[in-house]
Amino acid sequence: MKTVLDVLKGKLIVSCQALENEPLHSPFIMSRMALAAAQGGAAAIRANSVVDIAAIKQQVSLPVIGIIKRDYPGSEVFITATLKEIDELMTVNPEIIALDATARPRPNGQTLESFVGQIRARYPSVLLMADIATLAEAKEAQALGFDCVGTTLYGYTAETQGHSLPENDCEFLRDVVAAVSIPVVAEGNVDTPERAARCLALGAHTVVVGGAITRPQQITTRFVAAIEAHSIDRA
C-alpha cells in the first residue's frame, strides 16, 4: 500500500498560508485557495493553523502538511515549536506535521531530540517533516528519525542569511539530496514552474510552492518591479 510520501513523489505541494497582517488572512479564503490548487493538480497542501487546516479539509481530500506558527520569547524557532502546537494540530489530523528542526535554541531550552521523542511517544503514527537550513541539520534530522526533510528555512536563519534555494543551480538542495536517504522536500523561493521542475530533476522527492501561487500581493509586486525596471531602461 502506498504511503502519503509515496503519493507525493514527483508532485507539487501548494502552500496555502496568509498571516494576520496579510489581505487574504481567512480560513474560508485559504480553503478556497486549496480548492483552486487541487483543481490545478496539486498533490497536497501545506497550511498554517488549526482553523485553516480544518477549513481546507472540508474543501479538499488532499493530504495536508500542517504547521502552527507561534512566537516564543527567547527563541527564533516559531514553526510548530512545542508539544502544545503538536497537540493542537492533531485535533485536525494532518497527514504530515512540519516543524523547525534547525539547531537554534528552542523554547524552554528543549532539545530537538527530546521534542521528537515526545511527539513519537504521544503520536507514533504521525509523519514528521524537518524544516532545516543547513546540511548538518538535514543529517541530524535523518538521525533523529524524521520521515522527510525540507529546505524550508535555508536563507531564513542567521547562519544562512543572504542565501536562497535557487542559487548556483540549487546547490544546497543538491547537497541535501546527496547527504540523506530520506525524502527531500524542496521548499523556499521556488517561484517559477521551471524552478519547481528543476528541483525534481535534481533529486527532490517533491516540491512546495507557496507565494508564487497563493500570495497575490507578492506576485503583483514582482510584476510592478519588472514593469518599473523596463520603464527606467526606456527612459
Curated annotation (Swiss-Prot):
Q: Does the keyword Manganese apply?
A: no
Swiss-Prot/TrEMBL catalytic activity: an N-acyl-D-glucosamine 6-phosphate = an N-acyl-D-mannosamine 6-phosphate
Q: Which InterPro entries match?
A: Aldolase_TIM, NanE, RibuloseP-bd_barrel
List the coiled-coil residues: none
GO BP: carbohydrate metabolic process; N-acetylmannosamine catabolic process; N-acetylneuraminate catabolic process
Query: Which keywords does UniProt give here?
Result: Carbohydrate metabolism, Isomerase
- UniProt xrefs under Pfam families: NanE
Family of the protein in this entry:
Belongs to the NanE family.
The function of this protein is: Converts N-acetylmannosamine-6-phosphate (ManNAc-6-P) to N-acetylglucosamine-6-phosphate (GlcNAc-6-P).
Protein name per UniProt: Putative N-acetylmannosamine-6-phosphate 2-epimerase
What species is this protein from?
Enterobacter sp. (strain 638)
Gene (name only) = nanE
